[in-house]
Amino acid sequence: MRFLPLLASASALVASAFAAEQSTEERFIKFNRLARLSSPLQLNDVSYKSLTSTPRDYSVAIVLTAHDARFGCQLCRDFKPEWELIAQSWARGDKQQESRLFFGVLDFTEGRETFLSVWKTAG
């Protein structure tokens, strides 16, 4: 049973190392392709780290949320359609990506480690 957390940690480490090797422009191109398919970007711990790693020459606006009913965040569920509307409207208006701004969502179920990290630094 201890093997699974070790495997998850190793996978995250390898993904982080790969993300660090990508240049800012390569990361921009990668996330730009994804954003054209769906905006806001649906992130997880690995993609969040890649998207927000420095240096970068683009901006990110990310909502950390908890949509699952077991977390009891009604505000999260109420805000979701508004955030999606903002992200989609921005994407339609900035087709050439001149603003170099990405919108994203990181849900607790997909980004537990990121939430814990943010909570530690903020609290």
Features from the language model and the residues they span:
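N-terminal leader/targeting and pre-domain segments
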Residues: R2-V60, L101, G123
